[in-house]
Amino acid sequence: MPIHDWPEQERPREKLIARGPTALSDAELLALFLGSGFGGRDAVQTARDLLQAHGPLRVLLDRPAAELARLPGLGPARSCTLAAGLELAHRYLAAELEHGEAVGNNPAAVGRYLQHRLRGQAREVFMALFLDNRHRLIACEELFHGTINAAPVYPREVVRRALLHNAAAVILSHNHPSGDPEPSSADTRITDELQQALAMVDVRLLDHFVVGEGRPVSFAERGLLSPPQPRLFG
């Protein structure tokens, strides 16, 4: 049965207007992006087929647009629509950090942004957010790229980038492609090294987020960062 013949309260668009987007299933939300069905099936059925064959939703949408375009029921136009929707979400989350408020006062927004930016990456990516003395965002950079289970991290380069941006503080993040966000012993060790290296140039490490499935793990929230140490001379 075509969607326009469904009861009005069950049609995805009308349901969203009446009850909000959280009331829709993954297939119904995806159907709104598709607009119409494929191969004699309506948009919701087509969305369910895509999720069953190529899902779940995150796995499907993490594919590059060119790969999405080759899937039955998508094609170039629909794959571009999905890619544009994801980029809008990315920019919305980035805007939470870029409108002048102190990033250090909004760890939830930082975690959401980093999760969206790093989750689903096939290889480890190590990035840094550079902040001014009021903890406002100056720049966000991907610094190192690695393999499926490791990324080389060079403290000297992190310090160099912090000085280049005249940063007063830094938030670090990397992903675990395995999906497990629990910090490894290597994560803890390199975080300690980076914190010490940054402290030598009076740059404070505010946090280190590890991104996987679910909520990112925050070193600061876990109490895994060393307390700032006074610099002694003499």
From Swiss-Prot:
Zn(2+) binds at H174, H176, D187. Residues 103-225 form the MPN domain. Keywords: Hydrolase, Metal-binding, Metalloprotease, Protease, Zinc. A motif (JAMM motif) lies at residues 174-187. It comes from the Bacteria. Pfam families: RadC, UPF0758_N. GO terms for molecular function: metal ion binding; metallopeptidase activity. One of its GO terms (biological process) is proteolysis. InterPro entries: MPN (IPR037518), RadC_JAB (IPR025657), UPF0758 (IPR001405), UPF0758_CS (IPR020891), UPF0758_N (IPR046778). Belongs to the UPF0758 family. This is UPF0758 protein Smlt0399. It comes from Stenotrophomonas maltophilia (strain K279a).
